[in-house]
Every structure is written in C-alpha cells, then in structure tokens.
From Swiss-Prot:
Protein name from the UniProt record: Large ribosomal subunit protein bL34
Primary gene name: rpmH
Segments traversing the membrane: none
Keywords: Ribonucleoprotein, Ribosomal protein
Gene source species: Synechococcus sp. (strain RCC307)
Protein's UniProt keywords contain Ribonucleoprotein: yes
Length: 45
C-alpha cells in the first residue's frame, strides 16, 4: 500500500501566497507591509 505524503506543491504555494501575488491586491500589500514592520525574515512564500 502506498503512503500519502502531505508535502505541498511549490508551484501552487507560489501562485496562492507568493510575493508577486501579494503585491497585486491592496490587502496583499497590507500583509507585506505588516510583515516588514514586524521584521519578518520571510515576507512571503
């Protein structure tokens, strides 16, 4: 019997929550701004 792994797909992750996707919308830009303010090392996936 094969195991189901819970590894996500990188392309899908990028398309949903990547930096360029975030920059497209007003709320996405707000997310980036908040994460910059908090000093996050990773702003987006």
């Amino acid at each position: 019997m094969t195991k189901r792994t819970l590894g996500g797909t990188s392309r899908k992750r990028k398309r949903v929550s990547g930096f360029r996707v975030r920059m497209r919308s007003h709320t996405g830009r707000r997310v980036i701004r908040t994460r910059r303010k908090r000093g996050r090392a990773r702003l987006a996936v």
